[in-house]
């Protein structure tokens, strides 16, 4: 009986420490909106990216830690313009949800694709500049971008 009580108390302690520990370290979880900005926004970049742009940005923005993110898109427009898409044409997201919005005009983007022969930790990307409509998921009140769904 004492063993079961000790195990229950130990389990409770582990649960509480797991819940409290992140706040003790001073770290806070990145919000979905902040993650979107980190992973997809680069408004200050020139209109034409260098061939090594994706390799540099994917590493700088933390998308090659632990594994290589296969595909990512950077948007080279002011954040306000991208946020405004959340009030434009609503469309169905790839996952079937109804919180996606399509830009009414084309935007300057850079598409990064992991090269087939590339393996972690040496993540190597192709860099493709485009002018396309983007589709983003928005949440909150007011609505803000939280996920890059597609470019068309």
Swiss-Prot record:
Keywords: Disulfide bond, Endonuclease, Hydrolase, Lyase, Nuclease, Secreted, Signal. It is an enzyme of class 4 (lyase). Monomer. Endonuclease that catalyzes the cleavage of RNA on the 3' side of pyrimidine nucleotides. Acts on single-stranded and double-stranded RNA. One of its GO terms (cellular component) is extracellular region. This is Ribonuclease pancreatic beta-type. Its EC number is 4.6.1.18. Residues 27-45 have a biased composition (Basic and acidic residues). GO terms for molecular function: lyase activity; nucleic acid binding; ribonuclease A activity. The active site is at residues 40, 147. It catalyses: an [RNA] containing cytidine + H2O = an [RNA]-3'-cytidine-3'-phosphate + a 5'-hydroxy-ribonucleotide-3'-[RNA]; an [RNA] containing uridine + H2O = an [RNA]-3'-uridine-3'-phosphate + a 5'-hydroxy-ribonucleotide-3'-[RNA]. Residues 1-25 form the signal peptide. It comes from Rattus tiomanicus. It comes from the Eukaryota. It holds the Pfam family RnaseA. Its main location: secreted. GO terms for biological process: defense response to Gram-positive bacterium. Belongs to the pancreatic ribonuclease family. Disulfide bonds join 54-112, 68-123, 86-138, 93-100. Residues 25-53 are annotated as: Disordered. Substrate binds at residues 35, 38, 69-73, 94. It is found in: Secreted. InterPro entries: RNaseA (IPR001427), RNaseA-like_dom_sf (IPR036816), RNaseA_AS (IPR023411), RNaseA_domain (IPR023412). SUPFAM superfamilies: RNase A-like (SSF54076).
């Amino acid at each position: 009986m004492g063993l079961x009580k000790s195990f229950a108390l130990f389990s409770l302690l582990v649960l509480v420490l797991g819940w409290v520990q992140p706040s003790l370290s001073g770290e806070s979880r990145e919000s979905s909106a902040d993650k979107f900005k980190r992973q997809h926004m680069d408004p200050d970049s020139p209109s034409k990216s260098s061939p090594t742009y994706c390799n540099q940005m994917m590493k700088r923005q933390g998308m090659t830690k632990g594994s290589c993110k296969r595909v990512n898109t950077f948007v080279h427009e002011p954040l306000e313009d991208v946020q405004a898409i959340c009030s434009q044409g609503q469309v169905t997201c790839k996952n079937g949800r109804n919180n996606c919005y399509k830009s009414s005009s084309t935007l300057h983007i850079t598409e990064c694709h992991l090269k087939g022969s590339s393996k972690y930790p040496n993540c190597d990307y192709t860099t493709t500049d485009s002018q396309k409509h983007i589709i983003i998921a928005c949440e909150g009140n007011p609505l803000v971008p939280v996920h890059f769904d597609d470019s068309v």
